[in-house]
Swiss-Prot record:
This is Orotidine 5'-phosphate decarboxylase. Pfam families: OMPdecase. The active site is at K61. NCBIfam families: PRK00230.1, pyrF.
Length: 239
């Protein structure tokens, strides 16, 4: 799977989501089904988008006791999506259980979905880390430690900000994947995101994949913005 550009399909209405995808009929898309879409449309949206041939990231960010996460991953494996995720904060035993569940649920002849762990959300800043979560280490240090823990647990990669990708690449194996949301063009509103970069910056920093939502989904001309951002992503030089 090379260098996905996942569009986050965070829509509050089935019709809006359908109209949006219809306007992209000429493009081969990678899409992300997040909590909003999944809790609204359920498994039917996964089946529909899978049958339509999209590369799928099912972003449900599991975070629970190891037994529950393992059994849930076993169920999710049957959906045959490309990427699923957990929160690294659930710890090593939980991540190992997630991987075991995913392995056990993957049907013969199918490829196991890639399993990645959210390190620190891209909406989290240093103040929140220290004052709300009571983590007294620097953001970079926390993210790299969580990435190492994910790697030790056998996971394929992490979700992080592109800012942290060079440090993760130095600390983890070459094959370890970095999926980076918090992507904006210079002209876009940042909104609730904190650790933000452009697609070109993400590529230059070494991100394996980017995740883009509102810059495209809330744009007046989503297709034009997608093409502009994809050009920036594909065209940038990796350092
Ligand atoms: O796991 C994710 O996809 C994720 C992790 C993270 O740290 N930050 C983050 O923004 N995301 C998701 O990426 C998408 C970003 O959307 P926009 O901020 O609209 O581009 C949303 O669907 C988030 O749920």
């Amino acid at each position: 799977m090379n260098r996905p550009f996942f569009i986050a399909l965070d829509f509050d209405e089935h019709a809006k989501r359908q109209r949006f995808l219809e306007s992209f009929a000429a493009e081969t898309l990678d899409v992300k089904i997040g909590m909003e879409l999944f809790y609204r449309e359920g498994l039917s949206v996964v089946h529909e988008l899978k049958e339509a041939g999209y590369r799928l990231f099912l972003d449900l960010k599991l975070h629970d006791i190891p037994n529950t996460v393992g059994r849930t991953m076993r169920a999710l494996a049957e959906l045959d999506v490309d990427v699923v995720n957990v929160h690294a904060a659930g710890g090593k035993a939980m991540m190992e259980a997630a991987l075991e569940g995913l392995d056990a649920g993957t049907r013969a002849g199918k490829q196991r979905p890639k399993l990645i762990a959210v390190t620190q959300l891209t909406s989290t800043d240093s103040r929140m880390l220290a004052e709300e979560l009571l983590i007294d280490k620097a953001m970079d240090e926390v993210v790299v430690r969580y990435a190492q823990l994910a790697q030790e647990s056998g996971l394929d990669g992490v979700v992080c900000s592109a800012h942290e990708v060079p440090l993760i690449r130095a600390a983890c194996s070459d094959r370890f994947l970095t999926v980076t949301p918090g992507i904006r063009r210079q002209v876009d509103q940042v909104g609730d995101q904190v650790r933000v970069v452009t697609p070109g910056e993400a590529k230059a920093l070494g991100s394996w994949a980017i995740v883009v939502g509102r810059s495209i989904t809330a744009a007046a001309d989503p297709l034009a913005v997608y093409r502009e951002m994809n050009q920036d992503w594909k065209g940038a030089t990796e350092h």
